[in-house]
Every structure is written in C-alpha cells, then in structure tokens.
Amino acid sequence: MSVGVTVFSTLQENPVNPFRTMGSKRLYSNQYSNQSGTAEATAFVSFVNKENEGFFVFILNITEKKGFYVVMKLNGSEILLECLLEQGVDTVFGYPGGSVLNIYDALYKYSDKITHILTAHEQGACHAADGYARSSGRTGVVIATSGPGATNLVTGIATAYMDSIPLVAITGNVPVSLLGLDSFQEVDIAGITMPVTKHNYIVKDVRELADTVREAFYIANEGRKGPVLIDIPKDVTANLCEYTKKEPEPIASGKTIEAFEVNQAIALLKKAKRPFVYTGGGVILSDAQQEVKTFVERCDAVVSSSLMGQGGFDNTDLRYMGMLGMHGSKTSSLAITDCDLFVGIGTRFSDRVICDIKSFAPNAD
C-alpha cells in the first residue's frame, strides 16, 4: 500500500536516523519518546522527489505506546479493508469488476489477513455471505462492481433482509463526477435496494469512508439485524486520506421491558394449563436456545417452530411438535387448537403460519 505516515504526540519528538540505506531501498524511522516509553514509526520509502518532499511510504511496522497515536494516510480501498479488520472481518465474498479493481488490488495486499472467496456470479457471492453469517454468527461481507454486478446482489440482499441476517454489501460505482449522467454501468443501487436494506450509503468523499463503514456494521447488528449497502465511487477508492484505527462501538442493548408487562406475562403463565411456545429465527440469532429450553421446561409447554426457527429447540425432545403453519405438522395444528396460552419467542407471524387469523389458536390468551 502507498501511504503517508504522520505520528502525533504532545510529547517530545526525537528524530533518529531520518534516512538510512537498507539494501537498495531507504528506510525512514522516527522515534517519539517520553516517560511512558517509545513509539516508533518505521517505513520503506517507495518514492521521493528531487526536493525530498511529498514522499509516500510502505508501512513495515508501527509500535504504539501509551501517550501516542498514529495516523496513516491510505487510499480509500485500504481504508475500507482496515475498517473491515477493525470489525473482526477475515472473510469476504465477491466477484471483481472495473469499479472495484482498486479494492481487489488492496485485497491482494491484505491477503494474509482477509480471505476472499471468489464465486461464479455476484448473486452466488451474496447468498454465500448470507450463509456465512447464518452459520458463523458474524457479519457477512460481499463485494460487487457497478451496474449489473450491483443489481445481481439484490436477491441475496432481500433474503438477508427478510430473514434478519447481518450483511454488509459493498458496491463500486462510476467516479463521483459521472454520477447521475447515465454513465457506463451506472445504476442507482442505493435507490434500488432501499426497500430491502436497513440503511444504505453513497460515499462521495474518502474522508467519510471509515466512519461510514463503522456505522454500517453497527446498524447491521443493532436491534433486528439485517443488510446494509455501501456504494463507493471508483475515485473514492483511490483517493488518499488520513486513517486512524478505532475500536468497534458496543451494540446497544435491546428494548427494555417494563415491570408491569413482566408481571402480566407471569400471571398468564401461572394460569395456563396447556401452554404452547412458538419459536422463530430470533432464538437462533440471539443464541437463546438454552434459555428457551429452560423456559419451556419450567412452563411444561409444548413447542413448535417456524421455518427460520428450526434448530432453536431440540427436535428430538418429546415436547417438540414440529413446524407450525401451512407447511407444518398435523401435531402442531392440533396442539395450537387445544392450547390455552400461546407464547411467541423471536418470531414474526407471517401469513404462512397464521393462515386465517380468526381461527388461529381460538382458545388461547
């Protein structure tokens, strides 16, 4: 990566050997020291003009000590990958194209830290990122170029949206100066995906890129999880900007339940003779399988699940009635007709489950 390095400190600066020869390359090294220790920024010089100014460097090592912080000047593609590393990303899925070539150049340089899974088609890449998120509990990341590459992601993004899967889709686009001019392979992918994303961005300034990526990951994982799209014009991926590493923001806790609501639920559970518990995909996404098992045992309830909720409760348990709804089991249909209390956990009540609202769980509270 070609970057400029700036080391900031309110403490004493002691340059040591500003330039020295190392083989056929020059090594730049500055040390900054105080009572807390020494911070050293070391870099290869890849280009120096005749006046020895305005050079760019290849980072070898930066050691940060207490009292110091280091700001690197990276291009947009490198900032993007550094932000992915901040979020704990080590695997991305995608298919290359003209508008994301700078990102793929950076991926090659970061190949020891981030694994790229190449698919035959962008739609496959998006579904793979979605599946990766489901199986790993992490945020899926997919990369596609502008135009047809971006539109090929739509089905995968919509799937993640409907199933509440955390996904960050990164698309390239034409340079900022060509946006809105019907340029080659330009589409309004932000507008196209607006109905099937939690949020989306068009990053027109490289200085906004890092915080945009961080916010995208936060939104994808906060509350009801889902996909977020970041559209990055090609020139933004090449422009240089200062970058400072930041720790991910902690995800805010969910909705606070009022005491009177808890008391109402307890009263209903105590009164119930034939409780029925219906589990959905939220049980799996929140890793609440053990809590659900404990709850069911204490209530002595029978259990059914949605399609997304399968695996949230042990299907070999005698309390498990199978799936509920249009494609569910006869056992679950009979049990819900007979129950006197219906408890839904981590689910939405889709038309495939409710069918006819007037006859759904007719004897239940």
Functional labels for PLM-detected ranges:
Residues 24, 28, 64, 68-72:
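N-terminal low-complexity/intrinsically disordered extensions
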Residues 2-6:
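Compositionally biased low-complexity segments enriched in histidine and/or tyrosine
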Residues 7-8, 14-20, 26, 32, ...:
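N-terminal amphipathic/hydrophobic targeting modules at extreme N-termini
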Residues 20, 60-63, 69, 267:
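Residues marking helix boundaries in flexible regions
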Residues 69-365:
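N-terminal alpha/beta PP-like core and its mobile active-site loop of ThDP/TPP-dependent enzymes
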Residues 15, 42, 53-55, 66, ...:
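Intrinsically disordered, low-complexity regions of eukaryotic proteins
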